Amino acid sequence: MDWAEKYRPRHLNEMVGNREALHQMSEWATRWTVESPPLILYGKPGIGKTSSAWALAHDMNWEVVELNASDQRTKAVIEKVAGGSASTGSLTGAARKLIILDEADNLQGNADRGGARAIAEVIRQARQPLILIANDLYGLDGTIRNLCTKVQFKALPAKSLVPRLREICSREQLTCSAQALTDIAEQSGGDIRSAVTMLYASAIGKDTVGEDDVSISAKDSRASIFDLVAATLGYRQVPSLLDMSMSVDETPDTILQWIEGNLGVLPDRKKTAQAYAALSRADMYLGYTFLTQYYTLWRYATSVMLYGVHDVMKGRPSGYAKIMPPSRWRQMSVAKKQKTIREQLLSDMGTSMHMSASTVRNLYLCPISLLAKQFPEQFAKSYDLDVDKLDILIHDPATSKSIIKKIEDEKKQIEKELKKKKKEEDAKGKKARGSKKEKEPIVEETPSIDSFSSQEPGNPPEQPSTEPVEKDKKSSQSTLFSF
């Protein structure tokens, strides 16, 4: 059995590091109510996010329903699995049911179409604890981030990994040198899962593990696009920008857009022009690549863009700048989201008005918007609009938020009153049944057949009159031919 799974922590007090995050999770679980927002656990892979969620469920005696990247996560699947689980109780007798959505930032392509929207809807309607797990916090939809409490998991320092590795060696009766454990901890990059896997790979078929036995190459150390852009702009020193670009899981055209989107830090126009000249030349190579399908040109494009911009940045005072995704992407994302919301709104209104969405768009959208501005609350209630859909009609985000919040508060208040009324009715019914039971007269038991059979043959008991009974029997057994 793989040691990473064999020695997975079962309780929060067995977790290594991230004490602040674990304390935050424990406090959230202890004080959880239906109104509590879900948690987002985010950080590098392998630092204990999923294990801590399972350990929390074990400590709280909660049942677990998990949906990860290996499952299909379309809107229908999420609403069926997570949505149904989040709104119903446990069938196993557990106190509650914890919904874990692992790799929530990996909803991509047609396979996970509509998943992000479904997650947001599940969060709003959840009646059970919900935890989302992500490697990249900003890979999640903004709506989901705003609905959740964020808990950051940080990479573990090497010195905190060594005691855990030593404990595993002791349980496996394995002799391992201190230097070998230190090497494994340092090479893991704060990834405890990788460290345990490296120890397991080094110990296969051995009773003793030394420095020469350690499989240092077991961890694939990859750079992120943020590291590459920071190195290109001169914020960090690396041996080779080209080698670093090979370890980044992005294509050259994407790297070019990242660099271009962060050129606002350049000090003067002359240097800005020089940097854009390098990017322009690289873009020409990319164009030739797609035109000829000769992908060897990618290497030239990458070299020109990286070293061209890096050379311009020489002599600039070193410091720190926040590396951001290209602003164009954010604008495109907002436009795409607005278009999706608009099309959904038109479709819903067309269905309620018995006409097509295109007819609503071409003929009725303007008068509908005018009416919605005059009666926004009535429109929101009639068509069950959320903040985004109402904002499409009235073009006032602040008013839309206040109106939807007011409607949601009214719904919650009505729901509380109904629950309170139901509890009072149940209590009155229980009290009435109890008083009725006390007032019922004690009915003497009718002698049974066994009591007659227990009498002696010589002394037959005095039998009550059975004439009415016989009459009742005859009347109940009467047929069409009875006279």
From Swiss-Prot:
Region annotated Disordered, chain positions: 417-483
Extent of Basic and acidic residues compositional bias: 417-442
Gene: rfcL
Keyword tags: ATP-binding, DNA replication, Nucleotide-binding
Described function: Part of the RFC clamp loader complex which loads the PCNA sliding clamp onto DNA.
Sequence positions that bind ATP: G43, K44, P45, G46, I47, G48, K49, T50
Keyword Ribosomal protein attached: no
Complexes and interactors: Heteromultimer composed of small subunits (RfcS) and large subunits (RfcL).
Record's protein name: Replication factor C large subunit
GO MF annotations in UniProt: ATP binding; ATP hydrolysis activity; DNA clamp loader activity
Any one of the GO BP annotations: DNA replication
Family statement drawn from the similarity comment of this UniProt entry: Belongs to the activator 1 small subunits family. RfcL subfamily.
Taxonomic superkingdom: Archaea
Biased composition (Polar residues): 448-457
